[in-house]
Amino acid sequence: MNSDIVTRRYTSGDYAKSNPDWDAGDSPWKAERVHALLDVHGLRPASIVEIGCGAGGVLVSLRKYYPSADFTGFDIAEGLPSRWEKFRESGVNFVLGDYLESPGPASDLVLVLDVLEHLGNPFDFLDHLRSRCDYAVFHFPLDLSCVSVLREKPLLHVRRKVGHLHFFTRGLALALLQECGFEIIEARYTGAAYTAPNRSLLARFASLFRRGCHALFGDTGVRLLGGETLMVLARPVKTQ
């Protein structure tokens, strides 16, 4: 397992101190959106792996949609096994380790939800991931917007509190995946600005403007005011 300065943020417990709930409140919301994306394309994977599964809530919530599938969550944070204990009877397996270094066959579907922005080298990660999945679902927070760049404080906040090292727009997120050998099947906004749980009163108020701006100006509206996230269904490009 890599022990670089970025990885140590998670293995040392620093991340857990700043984010003790591991964003568990968002898990059912994310699972619903993963299922909706897979369902529209008729995908029913028999094996599902989540890299960076955190407290495990996404996989546990997703299992009701695919009761016969094999579910495995991987994470490198040493404090997480105690949180996984409550899901012992859930039918989801959890592994403390790196999926890309683990033995075994490739998974039908790999979930990479809110992970790439934390990695020191997302290019290397994606290059290795291509041989370990048939399909992948990615979730990107779209931190970059005209407002966030002008204010800068929101970008510094997510860097310090939750460890975002890379910042994305829709176009930048898709470019990264394509440059690393993934074919984009569908990319959709999640409506996070006005549907995600655990939003503050200020965030709910701002969502009114964001929703209107997005409705009027599409992608440009998202780049102006921000507040959105992007979910992407992709698969590795087959080499000849």
Model-derived regions, located:
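Short, glycine-/aromatic-enriched active-site segment of Class I SAM-dependent methyltransferases
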Residues: H139-H164
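Short catalytic micro-motifs in class I SAM-dependent methyltransferases
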Residues: L111-H118
